[in-house]
Each structure stands twice: as C-alpha cells, then as structure tokens.
Amino acid sequence: MKGKTMIDRKEDNQFHLVSKYEPSGDQPQAIETLVDNIKGGEKAQILKGATGTGKTYTMSQVIQRVNKPTLVIAHNKTLAGQLYGEFKEFFPDNAVEYFVSYYDYYQPEAYVPSSDTYIEKDSSINDEIDKLRHSATSALLERNDVIVVASVSCIYGLGSPKEYADSAVSLRPGQEISRDKLLNDLVDIQFERNDIDFQRGKFRVRGDVVEIFPASRDENAFRVEFFGDEIDRICEIESLTGRNLGEVEHLVLFPATHFMTNEEHMEEAIKNIMEEMEVQVNQFEAEGKLIEAQRIRQRTEYDVEMLREMGYTNGIENYSRHMDGRKEGEPPFTLLDFFPEDFLIMIDESHMTMGQIKGMYNGDQARKKMLVDYGFRLPSALDNRPLRREEFESHVHQIVYVSATPGDYEMEQTETVVEQIIRPTGLLDPEVEVRPTMGQMDDLLGEINARTEKGERVFVTTLTKKMAEDLTDYLKEMGVKVKYMHSDIKTLERTEIIRDLRLGVFDVLIGINLLREGIDVPEVSLVAILDADKEGFLRNERGLIQTIGRAARNSDGHVIMYADKITESMQKAMDETARRREIQMAYNKEHGITPQTIKKEIRDLISITKTNEAEVAEDTVNYSAMNKKERQEAIKKLQKQMHEAAELLDFELAAQIRDMVLELKSMD
C-alpha cells in the first residue's frame, strides 16, 4: 500500500538556535514582545527594525521560542538566498529549506494578437533548485521543526499536498512487497528507470537490488535489497561510489513531481477536460472562430492522449483545476497548503514583498486571458494562477511583517508595532544635512576627497541614468576612482563591484537605486542624495530612510541631501532619523558604549565562484583531447565544483557546470 497512514510526522522536535551572540540592545525586549504576542494569539505584528539592528537574529530567536513551522517570504531570489544562508547557520540541527522559482530562464506562454505571434512556453529548469523545492515539501510532511525561506513564487499553484502525501511510497525492512510492485509504484510517482545515468528522481535495478535516488537529494541515494517478495534491508549509499553509509529502518519516497494525481482522479479529470473542450469548441464555432476552434481541439486532444499514456504532459499545470477537483474560481493549492494549520509567517522587507503579493494575480490573468480568447488554452487555465492577496490572507494564522519602513498595508493590518532601534555595535543613525543644488558638483567633490584621504568610501544616488553617467565622467576627469552601477548589472557582477569598492579598487559608487540587496558596505561614511526634493519612488519617506540607512554601518556615517527645498518626505525622513539617533545616543551613554564601525570580512561567494570559473575555463580547453579515464576524473572534479557553487547559492554557475558535465558524459 502506498502512503496514506505511512508518514510518521515528527511533532515534538525543538528548534535549536546556535549563535555565539546573546540578544543585546533592544533585541531582548523586541523578542520578548513578539513571542508573548504570538503565544497570546495575536494575528499580526510589525517588527520595525532599523538597518543593521540584527532583524534576522531577532526573527531566529522568535522562531526558536515559539517553536512553530515558519515560512519566511522575501521579495527576490537573492535576498531569499541570503536569508536561507543565515538561517542555516543559526539552525544547523533543524530543517531549513529554500523554495523559489526553479526557472533559470522563463518565457511564459503568451499570444500577441496584433502580430499573430504565439510564444510557446520556454524555460530551463534549475535542477538544484528543483531538488531544494522537493526537500522543502517533503520536510513539511515529515517534521515540525521546519523553516522555509521562499520568494513570492510560494503563492503560485503547486499541486495537492494530499495527493503528494498519499502517493508517497513507504518502505521498511521485513515489509512484504515484490520487487516488480516497487518498480511499478516508483514509475507511478514519476520516477524514471535509468541503469546508467543515476541521478535525482531516478532508480536502477540489479537483480534483487533496487537503488533509488530521491527527488529531494543530490548526493546520497538508497539501496533496497529483496529476499523473495520481502524487503531484506534498506541502506543509505553514496550515489557515486555505492559505499554503504548505514542501514535505514524506514524510507519514505515522495513523488518526483508536485503535480500528482491517482488513476481514479485522472479519469475524472480527463472526462472534465474533454467536456470543457467541447463547450469551448462549440462557442468558438458559434462565433465563427473556426481557427480557434480547431486549435483548441487539436491541442487538448494531444495533451489528453499524453495524460492517458504517460500520466503527464507539458503544461500539465494548466489543467490543475481538473486534476485537483477544484471548482471554477477556487484558489489553487500552493506551498502554504503543505504547512500544518498552526504555522508562523514572517514577511521580510514587507514594504516591498506585500506589494508583490498583491500584484502577481492581475499580471498573470491578463496574459492567460489572451491565450484562452485565441484558442491556445481552455478557460480552466485561468485557475492555474497565483493567489489573490485576500486568498493569501486566508492562509495567515499568525504573521510578523519585518521592515525598517513598513508600508501602508501592514500599518492597516495591525497596530502592534515592535521597534528595534539599537544596534549591537552601538552605531548611530547618521547625521543628515540639506545643502543647495547650486555648486553641488564642486561641493560633492570636496566631500569625496575628504573621505578618500581617510580611506573611506562614498555612495552617490542620482535620479536619472544620464545624470549618473555625467557625474561619473566628471569625477573621473577630476581623478576620482569611481564606478557607476546601473540596473542591467547581474547579481554576480554586483557582488564583484561591491567587493572591489570594499577593497578600495575604487572609492565612489554611483547608482540610481542603491537599495538593492547586498549593498551594505561598512567602509561607506558618506551617502550623497542628489535631487532629494524630487518626490517619487526613491525620494519618498520610505526610500529616503532606506537610503540614509546605507551610512549607518560606519561610526562616521553622514548623509548630504542636495535640494532647493525641503519636501514633506525629506522632513519626515530627517525627523525619524533624528528620533532614532537620540534613542541610540541615550542608550550608548547609559551603557558606556562607543560606536564601532562594523568589521566585516571582505569575503563572499564571488571569491569561490571566480576560482571555479577560472578552473572551468581551464578545463574546457582540452575536453576533446582527453581519454575516457581523464574525462571521468574531469567529471568528478566538475561535479564537486557544481555542488560547491550550489551550496553558495550561485545557481547560475552551478547550472553552467552541470551543462559541461552533461557535454562530457555525451562524449563517451
């Protein structure tokens, strides 16, 4: 029998936080208040933490004390990756998982009527992220001490958690099951037999031994040994060498896809799909849209044939309403449905993330409606969608919004605002002054020279690309080592630029949006904001407070706003900064603390990825000249580099190396 009563979910695991630090400053009161409110049943709270006050550490303390499965949502993959790394360090003994979109590249299916262009869905799936997604869903069904760090893709349709759990194959030594029955069960849950290329989501057979590689792992697999029609023993093995790592008393294998359905449901789904197709064809024909009628019939019949034969088809998610047995308009199952009822949600940088959650649904519907109107998809495809904001809210049992500048939405949800203003380093919010725009270039140059003489760095933020480029050229002419960071720069390059700034390869960084993640540089003692009085996204109260915060990592932090008038946003930002600074100074005086610039080691993933890229480039030269043995060695070396890159969450590099491994394998 498969699944159902076989998953023994551990309910009594405890979160165990490992850190050399103790809560300090106003962290203890923030932690205490948040925990008391959660235990007291409060639904929503805001942790309003200034930049550099250790919000992630506070979140970790809260998770440990509340001891509930927790979903942490960030507004992009890079930020999610940083948080995932931090939480993994804080909770080495618990399940810290990572759930983001598994597409390295994604071109959604679309239709442009004006040019009669149909764009087929095109994507490349990142195998490493797919593994981590499977690891997240299986952990949620197996234990209670789980933290999932996710991007907003966690509100997209995922498939039924009940079907996923019920389809799981449960194996124990002494269990009566024939080898062939196990093989059939594995194929049913979308595992693929491959006796040569043994990797994630595959199994191989050697006589009475079946070796299985779960979809949620990438290093160790399992060996199931049979004696007749009974399992003799189950071992964990090293997938590359086959070395036995020890016996296992119970093995649960979750499906290799999140979109699972059983035979009975499949038949019902196919019946409903065909009925919907006939209705749609009749409607098109009645409107004289014969091309659309033929298109939808041809397409649907092909997909249904694939579902009958293979149990799967490309774009199966578009039929998820029928697969899940949902009614029209009902929300899809998402990662949130894999959590138990009583779980905690933390929204990082909530002023950005909540806006994303709100906007996802409308953009998705506009694109899909075009596909339905022109016969590329059935109307039920509209129900393969992200959650609406109110549907997301219905999943919320308890939530903490985390931001230095909470948005209007969060403030409407709750009046409980927990402040965290004191930095463990004693650092103060920077002093802010306003200077006129007349002669600003010369004034700025003088300030830059004063900083660079002391070995400090400068951030300058402009409003337009042209101004950023002109200013860069001017400063270069004046002998300043300067770089302009524009929006087209990739994450990896951005990390490299920040590293060079910290190392002193250049002294001044100019950009339009310096609020991007990872741009925290302790060496920056001056932030100059040009056109501070031009109201807008980066010059509103929140944008200004966040930008001012970029100078709060240095004990000499200073901010100059160049403007001809003081706008309401500027005044509010200055008032808030002054309020915090006063509280911080009073705390430092009372406790005899002298502010210390953060000493942050200049080491990040770029150092390792650069080495790997150099090694990879070196290796590519002689591939074709290698003999078989040398190629095998090269494959092992590359796979090691691939795992290192993946562990550092540099999935782009990991994917490049994986492609090279596949190329090498194809030569044999």
From Swiss-Prot:
Keyword Cytoplasm recorded: yes
Subcellular location per the Swiss-Prot or TrEMBL entry: Cytoplasm
Domain of life: Bacteria
GO BP terms, alphabetized: nucleotide-excision repair; SOS response
Domain Helicase ATP-binding: 36-423
Chief location: cytoplasm
GO MF annotations, alphabetized: ATP binding; ATP hydrolysis activity; DNA binding; excinuclease ABC activity
Domain UVR intervals: 632-667
Position of sequence motif Beta-hairpin: 102-125
Residues annotated as binding ATP: G49, A50, T51, G52, T53, G54, K55, T56
Keyword DNA damage: yes
Domain Helicase C-terminal residues, every copy: 440-606
Gene Ontology terms: cellular component: cytoplasm; excinuclease repair complex
Keywords of this entry: ATP-binding, Cytoplasm, DNA damage, DNA excision, DNA repair, Excision nuclease, Nucleotide-binding, SOS response
Protein role: The UvrABC repair system catalyzes the recognition and processing of DNA lesions. A damage recognition complex composed of 2 UvrA and 2 UvrB subunits scans DNA for abnormalities. Upon binding of the UvrA(2)B(2) complex to a putative damaged site, the DNA wraps around one UvrB monomer. DNA wrap is dependent on ATP binding by UvrB and probably causes local melting of the DNA helix, facilitating insertion of UvrB beta-hairpin between the DNA strands. Then UvrB probes one DNA strand for the presence of a lesion.
Domain observations: The beta-hairpin motif is involved in DNA binding.
Similarity-based family: Belongs to the UvrB family.
Assembly and binders: Forms a heterotetramer with UvrA during the search for lesions. Interacts with UvrC in an incision complex.
Protein name: UvrABC system protein B
Source organism of the structure: Streptococcus thermophilus (strain ATCC BAA-250 / LMG 18311)
